[in-house]
Every structure is written in structure tokens, then in C-alpha cells.
């Protein structure tokens, strides 16, 4: 049943075009530009090249990855049509879903969901973060991040606290990885991060996560999705969606998924993000 579900269902600006992709050798094929943000630990040239090649062959045209250092930059590129698709945070998606088309969501540990983690240094005695981190130093990742910014501020607001006055000082790290390292190095007393990123960093750099401790794991939220501008042709959107959905059944796709720590991609309904919409309604009021 799980297999059927899968079938149905701070970094410098950079564009990776690469060579060796059969689709890229076709004369006259304009590349499909796919945006990525630092939320994903895919800053490895070999993996990006393999993924680019897989997607290009699957959709029959070359693919470029366009990387930017903030969610807002990628969102702006999407809304202006300067990228054809992107893997974005769910918070920008729900704020602009009238102008975006939802293609697919990653499947992580069997579900299209992830959790936010509230972390502190390993030897910190924090047990109740809302009480114990008051007046201390805190790291936020990106102003448009649900797990790394909006959610902890929402929790404080719902608890009757002023998010702008709760901490003595807060910093923006511009990536969950940077936030985790800031906590590990005791540059800050706590941070709220994407649990998927923490889990992946535990796998590839356990010496970093070992110097942190998870105080709180949030309820599940819809995993950051793959989206396109609403104006992208339906034919291109369909081909791209099918390429993502087929990854779990293709040997090359399986290798990429393993490196990403994902089970696959699935078609999902916009209602997956209703809880995020409710938070956005409160935070943007």
C-alpha cells in the first residue's frame, strides 16, 4: 500500500547547468529552471548533477538548478516566472497558492510530513523552552520559514508572549544547518529548526547534532512542496510531476532519494497545508 501511495502520489547565487545529460544535448531545448533553497542539504555538486540528469532525461529537456540563499528570493523568481518550478517552504506556498500550482510533496519516513525541532546545547538544562529561554539568545533561520521562524513566534503569541520582546536577542542564520551549528557551538541558547534537516545532519555530521539536544518536537506539518507558477504549461507541469513521482521506482531515482533521505514524492492535495494556512492567517493579520 505504501508503494502504491508513492507511485500515486548562507550560499552564493548559483545555477548548475552541467554536462553529460542526454536531454541537454538536444538542440533548441530551453532548460527547465528548478529553484532550491538552503533548507535542503543538497549542496553537493555530484548529487545535484545526478539529480539534474535524472530529471532532464525524464522530462525530455535540460534542467538547471537555481540556488538562492533565502526563501524570498526563490519565491520572487517563481512569481515572476524566472524559474519554472521550485522546492519551497510550505509557508510561502500557502501565502501565494493562488499564483502557484502544487505538483508533489516529499515522502519522509512514510508520510508527506515533517516536524519542527526546538533545540538547545547538549549540556543546557532547558526543559520548558517558553520559560527557560526567556531573556536569552535565539537563532531563527529565515523570516519565511515555518519551522525556523513563524512557528516559534506563533507559539509565543498563542501563549500570550510578545515574540519581539521574549528573547534578549535573536539572530537570523538563513539556513537550518547554520542554526543547528550555532546551537552546537553555543553561539545561541536555542533555535527552532526543520526536523528533517536535523535528522539528515545527524546522519552526515553526527558530531554536530551530538552537541545539541531536542527539547520539543512539533506536531506534523506538510512537507515543503514542489510547485510551479500557475502559468506554466500543463504539459510541462505534468511531465515534471511524473518525473518526481517515478523516482521511487527508478534505480537512478532511488539512489538520489537515498542521498536525500526521502522515500519518494507523492501527489498531495492543497488541504495538506491547511494547518499552515491557519498559522499564516494569524501571523499575517
What are the residue ranges of the model-derived segments?
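Bilobed "Venus flytrap"/periplasmic-binding protein-like clamshell domains
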Residues: 29, 34-56, 68, 115-180, ...
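Ligand-binding clefts/hinges and TM-proximal coupling segments of bilobed small-molecule sensing domains
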Residues: 62, 140-158, 242-284
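A ligand-binding cleft/hinge motif common to bilobed small-molecule-binding domains
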Residues: 87-99, 157-158, 184, 189-209
